[in-house]
UniProtKB/Swiss-Prot annotation:
This is Receptor-like protein kinase. It catalyses: L-seryl-[protein] + ATP = O-phospho-L-seryl-[protein] + ADP + H(+); L-threonyl-[protein] + ATP = O-phospho-L-threonyl-[protein] + ADP + H(+). It comes from the Eukaryota. Its EC number is 2.7.11.1. INRPK1 and INRPK1b are expressed in leaves, cotyledons, shoot tips and roots from induced and vegetative plants. The highest concentrations of INRPK1 are found in vegetative roots, and the lowest concentrations in vegetative cotyledons. INRPK1b is more abundant in roots than other tissues. INRPK1a is expressed in vegetative roots. INRPK1c is expressed in cotyledons. Glycans are attached at residues 50, 74, 114, 144, 177, 186, 210, 245, 282, 367, 391, 427, 510, 524, 553, 584, 648, 677, 695. LRR repeats lie at residues 69-92, 93-115, 117-140, 141-162, 165-187, 189-209, 213-236, 237-258, 261-284, 309-331, 333-355, 357-378, 381-404, 405-427, 429-451, 453-476, 477-499, 500-523, 524-546, 548-569, 572-595, 596-618, 620-642, 643-666, 667-689, 690-710, 827-850, 958-981. GO terms for biological process: defense response; protein phosphorylation; response to other organism.
Length: 1109
């Protein structure tokens, strides 16, 4: 093509001097000049556009008037690319230009405005950029302007408003922005206005109501705000109205008194409130009505029954209540009826069975009850029936097997009983069948894949029995097979080659026999779950050929033999669980090559030999379970396992000392090395501050228990038993020695008998040692107090040299200029300091002028923050103390605060449940660290989303804890001078008191957790000042028990996943326990961490499984 272009242009150059000789008129010359801007010209044009012609009137795409002047240029979809040249202005008689469906780029030439006779412009479906030229306003004869599907930007040109007879404007699919002109109503002859899929903002202009000729109004997929203008009721000729996917609010103001012409109304994905206008029944031509994902409420109007032409009704994702109106059965043209995710109750009206053309019936996630009317099962046109997450009951009728068009049937999480009709699938092209979490009995129908269309079969959590139909193993279209938690028995099916199965879960049944080697044919499978069965024999090495496998769970069976080394070929494997079997031999060292592995569980088998060093090299491993085997030798170095959270090596034959680099595992929460032959001291554990569970019992450890571990002596004292030489290191005065029924104090000596010291001698030695220690302590304290100030001043002044970091920070912020302010709080102003692209800091300035003891308070904050280190707490980088103020330097968090993410981004930033759960877990870890792992403990005093900062990975970091009071070691709460905290987050006991406690922080955390779940503020405007988020959630939860009425609507789709539903429900319950009025009913933050992480471990496999359904 490039050769053709060059040849054509060369031809033009060589013939430029002969235009006159052959008398090619000026229009022809102008057209040839346009081609010089094209980079790709089709051969049809190069052959047709001949410079030797006298006129271009016979050229391809060109039409002329009677005087041989070009009046039409139509090159639509010819495959031309290049720029649209300014020479177009030479075509003075041009009335119509159509260049749609090509590859034009660059700007639309402003010279197009010189073609004063133009009536029709179509430049759609190209790649034009830049603004729409204002010069187009000079085209007073223009009637049609089509610029859709380009990359145009900038505002709507107001010059177009002066074109008197403009009828159609198509600007769809660009990047136009700014407000729609308020006087757009001046375009009085407009019939079509397409402004959808742009970035327009501001309100919908009320002047649109002046354009009574308007038939099509598309404003969808913009950033429009405010209410719909009531003036739209004036548009009696309107046929299409689409304002979906904006941020419009308020009641729907349309009375629909004069709506005889309207065909389609789409209001979806806005924030409309109130009910639907009853006047909708007047719109007798209405074919489609959509208002899903708004905040509409009240009953569904029965007037829809008057709309006999209505074929599509979308009301999903609102707050509609009451019963489904039986009048809907009169909508004889209905094809698609979607009322899901509301609060509808009662039975499904049998009148819906009269909708003989219905193809899609979606009523899921409501409160519907009773049996599904038999008439529904007789709608022969039905393709998709989605009734899941209701309270429906009864049995499935045999009639359903005659639904020949049925493609998808989802009834999960109801109370259906009886046998699944055995002919289901034999007469239809069924692709999806989901009956999970019901009470079905009997056998799996044998013909579900007889039409070779089945893609997803989900029958988990029922009471099905018998074997898996053999044809499922040969169902090449099957992608998801989930039969978990039934009473199925027999052997596993054999799988043929060229299978498309992606997800395979038969766990929790009674399957027996070997794992078939044919599982190796599932080349696309990503997850295999066969746990909790009675499978026997060896693990087939053919599983090693599953290169896409990510999850393999064979636990709780009676498998024996070795663990095949071929599994190391599954390079994407992230979970391998073969625990609770009879496996033996050594653990393959090749498993260390699985770089994506996050969980390895081989516990409760008979593995022997040493632990392969290669297993301890994975920096992604979170959970390593090797307990209950016959492993021997030393524990290999573990320092590379930086992400490890749980390590279980218990009940083996390990010896030697704990690895010295065990203390480097800063994320470790659970450690169990009990019932081994390990020796040495526990000194390496003293630096692991993240531990929430430890068991080192029944070993040969000696020496003192590190102070950081003594907290476990009360919660789990037996975790230290069976170590006869282990002791507690008591203070010299002996008055504060931790009590333990398991361990003795380290300074307690048994009577040595003859030749030993007398009791008096021992007492004198102890007394002398105590006096010496006291004197040494007093002398050290004197030196410390005497030197503290000078040392501090030296440290501070040393930071203020010309090349110091302080100097650079002040320079970057122009001496703390207000334009760098990114936040202000009760304790200071925060600035953003950018030293370089990879060195961005937050600088907090605390002013002391007029504040008594300000510098002392500053030192307290600095000392507190400076010694606290945790991945979920903001880290102090530097500090400087000056006469009038102090500066603290932190790492800048680019995602701002949790408050910003939840409430200030527009449009709201998408946050799935996994992200919210991680934020909740991280925040809990940080707060638990402050409460239990700092010595003395720290009460934050103002936990709220604004004090939870999020890094680039949305990992939470608690800030502003440096001003917290330091708890006395022997107290649980401390009186402060003033009531501190934020309204809405303060615990009830703190509203009129100055006492702050760890329990107060727990209450505040509960409020934050509710905000994560609901995406509502603690004092949300929707509460109308009558309550706070705790009261609102408790009221709705008590009255309805429906999580869907509480959670952020954007999470509703995820709640389809039963494991997510379970986690969100339990998180809500935990949040309410944290926010109990009575202090002693609240859990500790350590309890909160345990529960949140327990969900993560317990739901790890099931959540992965359900997300893949």
């Amino acid at each position: 093509m490039k050769v053709a272009v060059n040849t054509f242009l060369l031809f033009l150059c060589s013939t430029s001097s002969i235009y006159a000789a052959f008398a090619l008129n000026s229009d022809g010359a102008a057209l040839l000049s346009l081609t010089r801007h094209w980079t790709s010209i089709p051969s049809d044009i190069t052959q047709s556009w001949n410079a030797s012609d006298s006129t271009p009137c016979s050229w391809l795409g060109v039409e002329c008037d009677r005087r041989q002047f070009v009046d039409t240029l139509n090159l639509s979809s010819y495959g031309i690319s290049g720029e649209f040249g300014p020479e177009i202005s030479h075509l003075k008689h041009l009335k119509k230009v159509v260049l749609s469906g090509n590859g034009f780029f660059g700007s639309i030439p402003s010279q197009l405005g010189n073609c004063s006779l133009l009536e029709h412009i179509d430049l759609s479906s190209n790649s034009f950029t830049g603004n729409i030229p204002d010069t187009l306003g000079a085209l007073q004869n223009l009637r049609n302007l089509s610029l859709f599907f380009n990359s145009l930007i900038g505002p709507f040109p107001e010059s177009l408003l002066s074109i008197p007879h403009l009828e159609t404007v198509y600007f769809t699919g660009n990047g136009l922005n700014g407000s729609i002109p308020s006087n757009i109503g001046n375009m009085s002859e407009l019939t079509t206005l397409w402004l959808d899929d742009n970035q327009f903002s501001g309100p919908v202009p009320s002047s649109l109501g002046n354009i009574t000729t308007l038939q099509e109004l598309y404003l969808n997929d913009n950033n429009l705000v405010g209410t719909l203008p009531v003036t739209l009721n004036n548009l009696e000729n309107l046929v299409y109205l689409d304002v979906r996917n904006n941020s419009l609010v308020g009641a729907i103001p349309l009375d629909f008194v004069s709506c005889k012409q309207i065909d389609t109304i789409s209001l979806s994905n806005n924030q409309f409130t109130g009910g639907l206008p009853p006047g909708l029944g007047n719109c007798t031509s209405l074919r489609e009505f959509g208002a899903f994902s708004c905040a509409l409420s009240g009953p569904i109007p029965s007037c829809f029954g008057q709309l006999t032409k209505l074929d599509t009704l979308y009301l999903a994702g609102n707050h509609f209540s009451g019963r489904i109106p039986p009048e809907l059965g009169k909508c004889k043209s209905m094809i698609d009826l979607q009322l899901q995710q509301n609060q509808l109750e009662g039975e499904i009206p049998g009148e819906l069975g009269m909708l003989s053309q219905l193809q899609y019936l979606h009523l899921y996630t409501n409160n519907l009850s009773g049996e599904v009317p038999l008439s529904i099962w007789k709608i022969q046109s039905l393709q998709s029936l989605q009734l899941y997450q209701n309270n429906l009951s009864g049995e499935l009728p045999v009639d359903m097997t005659e639904l020949k068009q049925l493609v998808s049937l989802a009834l999960y999480e109801n109370h259906f009983t009886g046998v699944i009709p055995q002919d289901l699938g034999a007469n239809s092209s069924l692709e999806v069948l989901d009956l999970t979490r019901n009470m079905f009995t009997g056998h799996i129908p044998p013909n579900l894949c007889s039409q070779k269309k089945l893609k997803r079969l989900l029958l988990g959590y029922n009471y099905l029995e018998g074997s898996v139909p053999s044809d499922l193993g040969g169902c090449s279209t099957l992608e998801r097979l989930i039969l978990e938690e039934n009473n199925l028995r027999g052997g596993l099916p054999d799988f043929v080659e060229k299978q498309n199965l992606l997800f395979f879960d038969l766990s929790g049944n009674n399957f027996t026999g070997p794992i078939p080697p044919s599982l190796g044919n599932l080349k696309n499978v990503t997850a295999i779950y066969l746990s909790s069965n009675q499978l026997s024999g060896s693990i087939p090495p053919e599983l090693g050929s599953l290169v896409k496998l990510e999850h393999l769970n064979l636990s709780h069976n009676i498998l024996k033999g070795i663990l095949p080394s071929e599994l190391s070929n599954c390079h994407k494997l992230s979970e391998l669980d073969a625990s609770h079997n009879l496996l033996n031999g050594s653990i393959p060292s090749t498993l260390g090559s699985l770089t994506e592995l996050t969980k390895l569980s081989l516990g409760e088998n008979s593995f022997s030999g040493g632990i392969p060093t290669s297993l301890f090299q994975s920096n992604k491993l979170l959970n390593l379970q090797l307990g209950g085997n016959l492993l021997a030798g030393d524990i290999p170095p573990v320092g590379a396992l930086q992400a490890l959270r749980s390590l279980n090596l218990s009940s083996n034959k390990l010896n030697g000392q704990l690895p010295i680099d065990l203390g480097k595992l800063k994320m470790l929460e659970e450690l169990d090395v009990s019932h081994n032959n390990l020796s040495g001291t526990l000194r390496v554990l003293s630096t692991i501050q993240s531990l929430t569970f430890i068991n080192i019992s029944h070993n040969l450890f000696s020496g003192p228990v590190p102070p950081s571990l003594t907290k476990f002596l009360n919660s789990s004292p037996t975790s230290f038993s069976g170590n006869s030489d282990l002791c507690i290191n008591c203070p010299a005065d002996g008055l504060a020695c931790p009590e333990s029924s398991i361990l003795r104090p380290c300074n307690m000596q048994s009577n040595t008998g003859k030749g030993g010291l007398s009791t008096l001698g021992i007492a004198m030695i102890v007394l002398g040692a105590l006096l010496f220690i006291i004197c040494l302590f007093l002398f050290s304290a004197f030196l410390f107090l005497h030197c503290k100030k000078s040392v501090q001043e030296i440290a501070i002044s040393a930071q203020e040299g010309d090349g110091s970091l302080l100097n650079k920070v002040l320079e970057a912020t122009e001496n703390l200029n207000d334009k760098y302010v990114i936040g202000k709080g009760a304790h200071g102003t925060i600035y953003k300091a950018t030293l370089s692209p990879d060195k961005v800091y937050a600088v907090k300035k605390l002013v002391f002028t007029g504040i008594k003891n300000g510098s002392v308070s500053m030192v307290r904050e600095i000392e507190t923050i400076g010694k606290v280190r945790h991945r979920n707490l903001i880290k102090l980088e530097e500090f400087w103390l000056r006469k009038e103020y102090g500066l603290i330097l932190y790492t800048y968090m680019e995602n701002g605060s949790l408050h910003d993410i939840l409430h200030e981004t527009n449009p709201p930033k998408p946050l799935d449940w996994s992200t919210r759960h991680n934020i909740a877990v991280g925040t809990a870890h940080g707060l638990a660290y402050l409460h239990f792992d700092c010595d003395p403990a720290i009460v934050h005093r103002d936990i709220k989303p604004m004090n939870i900062l999020l890094d680039s990975d949305l990992e939470p970091h608690i800030s502003d804890f440096g001003i917290a009071k330091l708890l006395d070691q022997s107290a649980t709460s401390i009186p402060s001078n003033t009531v501190q905290g934020t309204i809405g987050y303060m615990a009830p006991e703190n509203a009129f008191t100055t006492v702050k406690s760890r329990e107060s922080d727990v209450y505040s955390y509960g409020v934050v957790l509710l905000e994560l779940i609901t995406r509502k503020k603690a004092l949300d405007p929707s509460f109308n000042g009558e309550t706070d988020i705790v009261g609102w959630v408790r009221s709705v939860w008590t009255q309805t028990g429906e999580i869907q009425k509480i959670v952020d609507p954007s999470l509703l789709d995820e709640l389809i996943d039963s494991s997510v539903m379970e986690q969100v429900t339990e998180a809500l319950s935990l949040a309410l326990r944290c926010a109990e009025k009575e202090v002693d009913k609240r859990p500790t933050m350590r309890d909160v961490v345990k529960q949140l992480t327990r969900w993560s471990i317990r739901s790890y496999s099931s959540s992965v499984r359900n997300k893949s359904k």
